Amino acid sequence: MNASYTNPRRLLLRAAAAGGWCSITGLAPLAWAHHGWSSFDQERPLYLQGRASEVKWRNPHAELVLERSGLALPADLAHRAVPPQVAPVDGRSLLARATLPQRTDARWMVELAPITRMEQWQVPEIRNGAELAVLGFTFAGEKGEPILRAEYLFLGDKVYGLRSRPA
């Protein structure tokens, strides 16, 4: 094996160079904007509904600002059918445990899925003004910015699972 690939100092220098390149090319904000699933409290699913604004249909994932229109769980939420996906997600349990956020922010940044996954689910491109709902996760204790990572997207009469591709 080439020593330059295992030398910790060289690896650090390569990472620093890559970070500098990202800053120069303007890609650093995209890297910092992306949150992995482990960043979120996946034990407390939240339900939000409202109108989409500031929609960004691009990678690393589609995102939008959801302007909340109401603060109520739909009576049928726990009984809604959810589509199967490749990842082992217990959708029925998530819907049954869904709650409303405790914080009162009127606008939430919603992280959807990468565009390729949105295409696999055949999600139509969401436009500003579209009515939608999401079930997902925010940071532990609802600390930090009002950001929700969507597990399920409710758009019209369709439900899309966003953790992985359709099963």
Annotate each PLM feature.
Residues 70-100:
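Mixed-charge, low-complexity intrinsically disordered segments
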Residues 119-133:
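Short nucleic-acid-contacting surface segments enriched for D/E, G, S/T with interspersed K/R
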Residues 106-120:
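Beta-strand/loop nucleic-acid-binding surfaces
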Residues 45-58:
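Structural detector for short beta-strands of small beta-barrel domains
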Residues 31-43:
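Short boundary/loop segments of OB/S1/cold-shock single-stranded nucleic-acid-binding domains
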Residues 1-10, 14-26:
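N-terminal secretory signal peptides
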Residues 140-163:
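OB-fold/S1-family single-stranded nucleic acid-binding modules
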Residues 58-69:
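Short aromatic-glycine-enriched beta-strand elements
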